[in-house]
Protein backbone atom coordinates (compact mmCIF):
# COMPACT_ATOMS: atom_id res chain seq x y z
CA UNK A 1 0.00 0.00 0.00
CA UNK A 2 2.77 2.47 0.93
CA UNK A 3 4.62 1.66 -2.30
CA UNK A 4 1.53 2.51 -4.36
CA UNK A 5 1.14 5.86 -2.57
CA UNK A 6 4.85 6.56 -3.03
CA UNK A 7 4.61 5.74 -6.75
CA UNK A 8 1.61 8.05 -7.16
CA UNK A 9 3.45 10.87 -5.37
CA UNK A 10 6.48 10.43 -7.65
CA UNK A 11 4.19 10.52 -10.69
CA UNK A 12 2.55 13.70 -9.39
CA UNK A 13 5.93 15.34 -8.80
CA UNK A 14 7.13 14.34 -12.27
CA UNK A 15 4.03 15.97 -13.73
CA UNK A 16 4.74 19.41 -12.24
CA UNK A 17 5.82 20.84 -15.64
CA UNK A 18 2.64 19.42 -17.21
CA UNK A 19 0.53 21.02 -14.48
CA UNK A 20 2.30 24.36 -14.90
CA UNK A 21 1.62 24.27 -18.67
CA UNK A 22 -2.05 23.67 -17.90
CA UNK A 23 -2.04 26.67 -15.55
CA UNK A 24 -0.28 28.89 -18.11
CA UNK A 25 -2.77 27.85 -20.79
CA UNK A 26 -5.67 28.71 -18.49
CA UNK A 27 -4.18 32.08 -17.55
CA UNK A 28 -3.59 33.08 -21.17
CA UNK A 29 -7.08 32.02 -22.26
CA UNK A 30 -8.78 33.68 -19.29
CA UNK A 31 -6.83 36.94 -19.59
CA UNK A 32 -7.09 37.18 -23.37
CA UNK A 33 -10.66 36.09 -23.93
CA UNK A 34 -12.43 37.24 -20.77
CA UNK A 35 -10.57 39.90 -18.79
CA UNK A 36 -9.20 42.19 -21.53
CA UNK A 37 -12.35 42.27 -23.70
CA UNK A 38 -14.60 42.73 -20.68
CA UNK A 39 -12.52 45.62 -19.35
CA UNK A 40 -12.71 47.36 -22.72
CA UNK A 41 -16.50 46.99 -22.73
CA UNK A 42 -17.41 47.99 -19.18
CA UNK A 43 -14.85 50.67 -18.28
CA UNK A 44 -14.24 53.97 -20.05
CA UNK A 45 -11.18 54.14 -22.29
CA UNK A 46 -9.00 56.12 -19.86
CA UNK A 47 -9.68 53.81 -16.90
CA UNK A 48 -9.39 50.69 -19.07
CA UNK A 49 -6.02 51.92 -20.29
CA UNK A 50 -4.79 52.41 -16.72
CA UNK A 51 -5.99 48.97 -15.67
CA UNK A 52 -4.57 47.19 -18.71
CA UNK A 53 -1.22 48.97 -18.31
CA UNK A 54 -1.17 47.66 -14.77
CA UNK A 55 -2.24 44.09 -15.50
CA UNK A 56 -0.36 43.18 -18.73
CA UNK A 57 3.19 43.44 -17.35
CA UNK A 58 2.11 41.27 -14.41
CA UNK A 59 0.50 38.81 -16.84
CA UNK A 60 3.77 38.47 -18.77
CA UNK A 61 5.77 38.23 -15.55
CA UNK A 62 3.54 35.49 -14.09
CA UNK A 63 3.86 33.40 -17.26
CA UNK A 64 7.62 34.04 -17.28
CA UNK A 65 7.95 32.89 -13.66
CA UNK A 66 5.76 29.82 -14.19
CA UNK A 67 7.68 28.86 -17.35
CA UNK A 68 10.97 29.26 -15.48
CA UNK A 69 9.70 27.12 -12.59
CA UNK A 70 8.59 24.49 -15.09
CA UNK A 71 12.00 24.47 -16.76
CA UNK A 72 13.77 24.23 -13.39
CA UNK A 73 11.47 21.37 -12.36
CA UNK A 74 12.25 19.60 -15.63
CA UNK A 75 16.00 19.81 -15.01
CA UNK A 76 15.79 19.13 -11.28
CA UNK A 77 13.59 16.07 -11.75
CA UNK A 78 15.77 14.82 -14.61
CA UNK A 79 12.81 14.51 -16.93
CA UNK A 80 13.97 13.48 -20.39
CA UNK A 81 11.44 15.45 -22.40
CA UNK A 82 13.71 17.69 -24.42
CA UNK A 83 10.99 19.06 -26.69
CA UNK A 84 9.10 20.29 -23.63
CA UNK A 85 12.30 21.92 -22.32
CA UNK A 86 12.86 23.73 -25.61
CA UNK A 87 9.25 24.90 -25.68
CA UNK A 88 9.58 26.21 -22.11
CA UNK A 89 12.76 28.08 -23.04
CA UNK A 90 10.92 29.67 -25.97
CA UNK A 91 8.05 30.68 -23.66
CA UNK A 92 10.53 32.29 -21.28
CA UNK A 93 12.13 34.25 -24.12
CA UNK A 94 8.74 35.31 -25.51
CA UNK A 95 7.55 36.56 -22.13
CA UNK A 96 10.80 38.44 -21.49
CA UNK A 97 10.36 40.21 -24.83
CA UNK A 98 6.70 41.00 -24.08
CA UNK A 99 7.52 42.26 -20.60
CA UNK A 100 10.26 44.60 -21.79
CA UNK A 101 8.43 46.02 -24.80
CA UNK A 102 5.28 46.80 -22.80
CA UNK A 103 6.63 50.18 -21.56
CA UNK A 104 7.64 51.01 -25.14
CA UNK A 105 4.10 50.17 -26.28
CA UNK A 106 2.66 52.45 -23.60
CA UNK A 107 5.01 55.29 -24.53
CA UNK A 108 4.12 54.90 -28.22
CA UNK A 109 0.43 55.15 -27.33
CA UNK A 110 1.04 58.21 -25.14
CA UNK A 111 3.00 59.92 -27.93
CA UNK A 112 0.40 59.06 -30.59
CA UNK A 113 2.86 56.87 -32.49
CA UNK A 114 0.04 54.62 -33.63
CA UNK A 115 2.01 52.64 -36.21
CA UNK A 116 4.72 51.75 -33.68
CA UNK A 117 2.04 50.95 -31.11
CA UNK A 118 0.23 48.67 -33.57
CA UNK A 119 3.40 46.81 -34.54
CA UNK A 120 4.58 46.27 -30.97
CA UNK A 121 1.11 45.41 -29.71
CA UNK A 122 0.74 42.88 -32.51
CA UNK A 123 4.15 41.45 -31.56
CA UNK A 124 3.01 40.86 -27.97
CA UNK A 125 -0.24 39.31 -29.18
CA UNK A 126 1.63 36.96 -31.53
CA UNK A 127 4.25 36.03 -28.91
CA UNK A 128 1.51 35.35 -26.36
CA UNK A 129 -0.34 33.24 -28.93
CA UNK A 130 2.87 31.30 -29.59
CA UNK A 131 3.30 30.80 -25.82
CA UNK A 132 -0.26 29.48 -25.65
CA UNK A 133 0.36 27.10 -28.56
CA UNK A 134 3.66 25.91 -27.07
CA UNK A 135 2.00 25.17 -23.74
CA UNK A 136 -0.83 23.30 -25.45
CA UNK A 137 1.82 21.30 -27.33
CA UNK A 138 3.61 20.57 -24.04
CA UNK A 139 0.33 19.34 -22.56
CA UNK A 140 -0.34 17.09 -25.55
CA UNK A 141 3.26 15.87 -25.69
CA UNK A 142 3.21 15.10 -21.96
CA UNK A 143 -0.08 13.22 -22.20
CA UNK A 144 0.97 11.06 -25.13
CA UNK A 145 4.60 10.46 -24.08
CA UNK A 146 4.39 9.18 -20.52
CA UNK A 147 7.62 8.67 -18.55
List each model region and its residues.
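Polytopic transmembrane helical bundles with strong interfacial aromatic enrichment
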Residues: 4-147
Amino acid sequence: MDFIIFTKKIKMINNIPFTISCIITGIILFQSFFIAPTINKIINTKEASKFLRYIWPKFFLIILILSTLSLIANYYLGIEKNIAKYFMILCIVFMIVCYFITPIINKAKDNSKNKLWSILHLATVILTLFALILNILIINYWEFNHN
